[in-house]
Amino acid sequence: MKFSEEKNVSNNPTNFEGGLDSRKVGQNRRALGVINQNLVVEGRPYPCVVNKRALSERNDVCEKKQADPVHRPITRRFAAKIASTKTSNAEGTTKRSNLAKSSSNGFGDFIFVDDEHKPVEDQPVPMALEQTEPMHSESDQMEEVEMEDIMEEPVMDIDTPDANDPLAVAEYIEDLYSYYRKVESTSCVSPNYMAQQFDINERMRAILVDWLIEVHDKFDLMHETLFLTVNLIDRFLEKQSVVRKKLQLVGLVAMLLACKYEEVSVPVVGDLILISDRAYTRKEVLEMEKVMVNALKFNISVPTAYVFMRRFLKAAQADRKLELLAFFLIELSLVEYAMLKFSPSQLAAAAVYTAQCTMYGVKQWSKTCEWHTNYSEDQLLECSSLMVDFHKKAGTGKLTGAHRKYCTSKFSYTAKCEPASFLLENEL
């Protein structure tokens, strides 16, 4: 009871009226109010100021804000306020430290850290930096795979653009050329058949073919007519012995048969007699025609080098210049007896390959060409080297019919191209 009375006296100053005691109590109440303002945070509201400090310094600042203990009488109410203030400060510090650890890059709670004063252990490691090395290694592997894919040259489908062309027969074209390769051996002759001829030789054959190239150009005939003409001559001479004075007649009749088979408008017999300087009569021409078709057993239609040339030029995506150059090289080969050892498909492939090397100045043979020709680059080098040699000598000597033909504007002066001499150097 005595303690409660003292409490009521200290807390209720209105019980005292004036005097020294009342002044002392009033001064004590003002002093307690000042102390409460210094210790209790819940007093006067302050403006929100955001300072950039390190997390370690922030804890020090919070500790410094706690005022030194004041020696004063403590009531129950004041003690409860001090205890609650310490508890709230401790909980706030714990929450801020946990928040800084969990989300160091978050801006929702306005925690700003100065990089200059930030300790090394407080710096978060970005995820991008942690995965830098694996990402680089994976990208390098991807680049290596992509480079390998680039190096692997794909085989192009050359028949898709002609799918809607009924004359191209794109759906049967592979079967057709597969058949041509099987039967092309029937159009080949023995490379030494001239040995059984007693009155003619290789040189005479070359003169005849060179003259027929000029006649072919004079009548403006198609390419396939010339190739079939030379094939008929060789196949006939392999089976039949011919005297020297009848050799030109064999050439005229072979061209007549080829024109009947390939051309829309066939030259008349009188024109052929006239171009031969009337060396033969009409009767002799018709008689030799009967002899030739019987010797060949009427087997006129055979795959020549021209048949394969059209396909291989398409595989090479040849333009007009490359096409003319390839035909120039293969017509030079028609004159040479030594080229009979090569099959028609190999001659055509070698002509396309040599023409590409001549145009580009380097060896050029794509996977598409190799696929459609069935010949690798190594398989064509021997034939190609001979063609380059013929090209170098085309403008010299007496047999220059093909060179003069391809030196005109009609054939874009193709014969004036520099030969691919580097193919001969590689052979050496």
UniProtKB/Swiss-Prot annotation:
Keywords, in A-Z order: Cell cycle, Cell division, Cyclin, Mitosis
CDD domains on file: CYCLIN_AtCycB-like_rpt1, CYCLIN_AtCycB-like_rpt2
Record region (Disordered): 1-22
Keyword Cell division among UniProt keywords: yes
InterPro entries: Cyclin, Cyclin-like_dom, Cyclin-like_sf, Cyclin_A/B-like, Cyclin_C-dom, Cyclin_N, Cyclins_cyclin-box
Keyword Cell division attached: yes
Protein name from the UniProt record: G2/mitotic-specific cyclin-1
